[in-house]
Amino acid sequence: MGSEMCIRDRNFRDAIAAKYEHFSGIKVDPESEIVVTCGSTEAMMATMLSITNPKDKVVIFSPFYENYGADTILSGAEPIYVPLVPPDFTFSIEQLENAFKQGAKALILCNPSNPCGKVFTFEELTAIADVVKKYDAYVVTDEVYEHIVYAPNKHIYMQALDGMRERTIVCNSLSKTYSITGWRLGYVIANPEIIDRVKKVHDFLTVGAAAPLMEAATVGLKFDDKYYDELAAHYAHMKEVFVGGLEKLGLKYTDPQGAYYVLVDVSEFGVKDDVKFCEWLAQYVGVAAVPGSSFFREDVHNLIRFHFAKQDDTLNEAINRLAGLRKAVAEAGDVEWR
């Protein structure tokens, strides 16, 4: 009885549908077009298991959130990587189409992107949609950062594009928008045929999300536009503090258009091994970063990722410590990362 309550919590799904329609303009049926999952991690895994067969191929833009490759492989499919080329993280339509010529069944699109902060333009999304329609495939979207977008950029919903209503499978989460990462509340929005499969997979993966947390989160889903405006302004402030600090230090970075990550180019320091460099950075400079190579399929070792969703005091202290980076590098001598 409790499991059935979790699966069929109509209040939560009604609230998801209403919010999604408000921002995307798309009306969805809470009963037949939404499945509630234990976070977007399960949403993506359940989706991949629902739409792929063993040896199917799935297109993934690189750099990418590491789960995408793992989810594809765990579902028995094979990833095909298409590069987003720094510093603007543009992609080649020819390379994208070549990936689909290999028989790709779907493309995973993280928009805004983790780790590079790219927000795909209308023209880019339309180009992707045209290729997907041409090869009769799906787009699986990860839109967890939909409300963390920096002006003048705008988040555009793939499902709202012409001909993409039935071809788009939306994976989303409440974690980032409402700062409730530990609650593990996510959802899938798709056409009824896909949702019917996702429901079955979801039942065997986790059975259901926590009913009390769904009831509590329903309140958040009903917040008015003022909340989302304030959220965007709050993240824009954090970006200004940290990325503005990087600018003052003269460090080379790619300006994030959305999400709360920034990739910094450390090639000026002669970095050959970004993993070793990040270990050294934490130990000798006192600032933590993630090696960029963990997100790229390509041989990229000159980028590191910083996360700036922190209090001002923490961000300012990080910038103060990074101010000593060049001096620390000069005094480092013979280090493993060079």
Locations of regions flagged by a protein language model:
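Long amphipathic alpha-helix in the N-terminal Rossmann-like dinucleotide-binding domain
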Residues: R8-D14
